[in-house]
Regions:
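Juxtamembrane/disordered regions of integral membrane proteins
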Residues: 4-144
């Protein structure tokens, strides 16, 4: 029988894929809902699918580079390192996403920038809740 700590640490590759897919489906839905309140041209669903795919690739690349630059025990990373990680991840991602929003939704830079910030803040809250719920649900299903 696995101890509680092992249940939280050990995740198979297939479970990580399922976790990522479920997360990104939620992001697509939330992004489309946010876009409902923003004046735009274009297809928000297509934009959100593109962002979802970009985010998955960016997550892999960014975390690989970050882990090389900040080696050591990932569990020992404190709030400062985690904050730097999050700000760099989102800030660099926005460098790519703002021009895409401008082009696909036919928005000005300012409108695309504000839309991206809004989506980022909403997704930030979703990320917190999603991972909290997922970890608890996972514990229930893994122990079952």
């Amino acid at each position: 029988m696995l101890c509680l700590l092992e249940v939280f640490i050990i995740m198979s590759t297939s479970e990580r894929v399922v976790q990522s897919i479920l997360y990104e489906l939620g992001c697509i839905l939330i992004g489309c809902l946010v876009m409902h309140f923003v004046p735009h041209e274009g297809q928000p669903f297509v934009l959100m699918v593109i962002f979802s795919l970009l985010a998955m690739v960016w997550n892999f690349v960014f975390n690989w580079i970050f882990d090389k630059l900040v080696p050591g025990d990932r569990l020992a990373r404190g709030p400062i390192i985690r904050t730097v990680h999050a700000v760099l991840f989102e800030g660099l991602f926005m460098i790519a996403t703002v021009p895409i929003i401008m082009y696909m939704m036919q928005m000005s830079f300012w409108m695309a920038f504000m839309t991206d910030i809004t989506m980022t803040l909403v997704i930030l809250g979703y990320t917190y809740v999603y991972n909290w719920v997922y970890d608890r649900a996972r514990l229930y299903f893994v122990e079952a």
